[in-house]
């Protein structure tokens, strides 16, 4: 079975490759430059903004994992449209998409890249599963976040203290994606994350358990968080991230639907915060 993994050297794609390899599969890593890929899978260079490049990569693939990398809204829209066109042309047997926590629907009249991607893929007629994580636990390992934990015993993050989220790790999401790539009978939405949703205090408690020292949660403004991550992602990369947290500030919570959760549909339960920290040796 030929399985192509977008962004195979990145935070989302690399764990999917590792999970598939552990299951005895031979995934193909779709990366920007195969000569710089240091992973253990076979690799192919792909320009996600080029329909021609995508069609070449997709041809012969039985299953494809797709997600949009961090970038400006314009860059992501270009990639979404190119991916849709390539899938429509090639018609692979199976496509699995991660929304990466991005909102599908935006303000009236505003095209959201992930919304454009999903609408086009659904119209293509291919077997499609959509994995919908909310927030990744790995965000809590960003240097601006971990410095607060280790220096001040404070977990600072741009969410209200009462904002419940179905947090999930990339490791848990990879397990779900790998399962779906190998099982085309499951289609539609599959939510990944903690049920019930976790509050900031729950996250801090996980760090407290792992570090064996008290850690408290402190809500941060999206703008303050954005200023701290610009050195990591650049302004173009940080802007949509900050916008997503401004959007979250207007919402009641971000909890997956139990009926369409991976727990219900696939029998897969995500790690606790403390277990995840132990697994990644943070």
Roles of regions detected by a PLM:
Residues 38-50:
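Rossmann-fold cofactor-recognition segment
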Residues 223-282:
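A hydrophobic C-terminal alpha-helical subdomain
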Residues 28, 82, 269-273:
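Contiguous, function-dense segments enriched for cysteine-driven chemistry
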Residues 41, 62, 93:
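Conserved acidic residues
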Residues 2-34, 49-52, 59, 68-78, ...:
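Oxidoreductase cofactor-interface core, primarily capturing Rossmann-like NAD(P)-dependent enzymes
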Residues 1-2, 282:
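Actinobacteria-biased recognition of intrinsically disordered, low-complexity terminal regions
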Residues 66-69, 260-261:
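Short glycine/proline- and acidic residue-enriched helix-loop micro-motifs
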